[in-house]
């Protein structure tokens, strides 16, 4: 398989965000998914970082744009811009720090306040490799996810456990939600078929929301270089 690059053509682009307290491992989850790297010297994110990875959905290539922001309160001013246009979110806590789990509902409230109500959310208990230091049991994560209608996985960015699965669960569910909405809107409008773009390859939606009706979601190889930094005033 040829290596991905940022410039590789894609059929669709959508945005997802990583949220949770500082130092829960958001940046390393992003680095593992986008570049298959783990940074032992990872430092707190300043402002916003985002990375890309191409995902095969049937015969289409979707470029997933994953955003990571600092968990510190002093960066809360970027909130509305950060969530705008997001179709999915990984809501992350550290299984070795009870406070990060206790703050999950605060982050979920903020997400639901600023993001689209149809945003797909996966609850992620990260650092599962640190079992001996666990403060949050796996069943607690499952119970919270069930009560809030979220998906749930425990991950280890260090050991690369369930990282791919967490992102692909989110991407697959985004496809289902958007496809169902397209079908419902077309039925309400009396349209026989979805509006097709210029090359006849897919359904046209606002930027970041173009998904086609297929049933297979697989990721390509991680990008060799995909991170970018930006800040909002």
From Swiss-Prot:
GO-annotated molecular function: GTP binding; GTPase activity
Predominant location: membrane
Pfam families (UniProt xref): Ras
Residues bearing a lipid moiety (S-geranylgeranyl cysteine): 230-231
Keywords carried by this UniProt record: Cell membrane, GTP-binding, Lipoprotein, Membrane, Nucleotide-binding, Prenylation, Protein transport, Transport
Residue stretches spanning the membrane: none
Lipid bilayer topology: Lipid-anchor
Binding site for GTP: 20-27, 68-72, 126-129, 156-157
Family to which the UniProt record says this protein belongs: Belongs to the small GTPase superfamily. Rab family.
Protein name per the record: Ras-related protein RABA6a
Source species: Arabidopsis thaliana
Gene: RABA6A
């Amino acid at each position: 398989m040829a290596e991905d690059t940022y410039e590789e053509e894609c059929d669709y682009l959508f945005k997802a965000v990583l949220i949770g307290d500082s130092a829960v491992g958001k940046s390393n989850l992003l680095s593992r998914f986008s570049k298959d790297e783990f940074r032992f010297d990872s430092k707190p994110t300043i402002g916003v970082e985002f990375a890309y990875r191409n995902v095969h959905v049937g015969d289409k290539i979707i470029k997933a744009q994953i955003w990571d922001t600092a968990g510190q309160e002093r960066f809360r001013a970027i909130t509305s811009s950060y969530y705008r246009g997001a179709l999915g979110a990984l809501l992350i806590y550290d299984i070795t720090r009870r406070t990060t789990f206790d703050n999950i509902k605060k982050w979920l409230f903020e997400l639901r306040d600023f993001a689209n109500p149809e945003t797909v959310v996966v609850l992620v208990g990260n650092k599962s490799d640190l079992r001996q230091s666990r403060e949050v049991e796996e069943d607690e994560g499952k119970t919270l996810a069930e009560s809030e209608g979220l998906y749930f996985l425990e991950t280890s960015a260090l050991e690369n456990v369930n990282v791919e699965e967490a992102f692909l669960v989110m991407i697959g569910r985004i496809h289902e939600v958007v496809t169902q909405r397209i079908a419902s809107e077309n039925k309400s409008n009396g349209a026989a078929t979805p509006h097709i773009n210029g090359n006849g390859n897919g359904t046209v939606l606002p930027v970041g929301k173009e998904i086609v009706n297929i049933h297979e979601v697989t990721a390509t190889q991680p990008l060799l270089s995909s991170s970018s930094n930006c800040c909002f005033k």
